[in-house]
Amino acid sequence: MKKCTKINKNWLVPALGVLLAALALVFGKTGISQNGFTLNQYHNADAKFIGDHIITSVDEGIRILDLEGKTVASYDGLAASWMYVMEDDVESRGPEDHWFIAYSNHADETHILELTADFQLVEDRIAVTTDTLAIDPILVKMEDGWLLTNTEIDGTINNPSPDGDNGIYSVHLYSSADLKTWEPLTTIISKKQNLEDGDIRYLDGTLYYFFEMEDYDKGPSKICVMTSDDQGGSWSDPIVLLPNVADNEMASCEQTDYGWRLYVSSDYACVGESYQGASVYYNDYKEDFTPISTYQRSEMPDNESVRLYEAKEIDGQMNFLFARNFLTDCDLLLRTMEKGDEMQ
């Protein structure tokens, strides 16, 4: 395990000032090309890609941003803290296709939000209400309907201590034929551990549920996957993709030519510092989740103090959407690079 090394940046300030001044003379303005954007002290709660835009929430208000960080739409009266965009068959989308977003909030509601292709509000409806807080909804299109999950927490939320009493986290699965009426289907997993940052992929008749499992908030955590071959009726035992040697925060897991690629933000090089010591890593697996390589540090720009929301390919480029200094400044950043360049 590598030891986290702190860099004294005091000597960098004068040099950076000289560089900015030189750039101002050359280009007529100050600043350095960021290959994306930076929104300082944005303090958003969640963020996801929605096509070639971004959906995020600030003070539980939902906003749509373009890839330059400009707000192009917002929705009065809607409150969201956790969001999930259903993006099946994105490449074949047309102007008549609508976006469907699952979101949940501190009113113990899980909603389905429907937007037009250009982000006009069509309908917002409550899908499920719970007795206690429910986080991390997921929406999946099936052949004959939809599946929806949320993670309900009974007891202590985000227990901060290894000696504390953790709440029970239960990942509930619901089904619907019309996106309006939802029926309980099963509970995928229930643990007296934090179950967070879930995502589902549906491929060739199999559902894959990816998630983080940790004993206490910001402590060491596993990344796991469970599978279902009967439309979500029953699920396998968890397969551990990354062990709990660091605070691993899952962002996305996508199919590749050889199997799977998992993106996480992790304090692997600075264990114990959680978000403030985290960087983006990618991990490759065969189709059966046998590891090929793990904890490969991404060459993404500004890869320090990262809480990664999502990594996504758009028009041949890798796009990384993340918070910097999540627990303090909570800046929102987008960084882009050519596909393949994120590898060391």
Which role fits each region the language model picked out?
Residues 3-5, 28, 334:
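A detector of low-complexity, intrinsically disordered, Ser/Thr/Gly/Pro/Ala-rich segments
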Residues 3-18:
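N-terminal Sec-pathway targeting helices
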Residues 8, 24-27, 254:
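Compositionally biased non-globular segments, especially hydrophobic aliphatic-rich helices
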Residues 19-22, 106:
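Conserved structural scaffold segments of CAZyme catalytic domains across common CAZy folds
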Residues 21-35:
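Bacterial Sec-dependent signal peptides at the C-terminal "C-region" and cleavage site
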Residues 31-344:
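Carbohydrate-active catalytic/glycan-binding domains of CAZyme proteins
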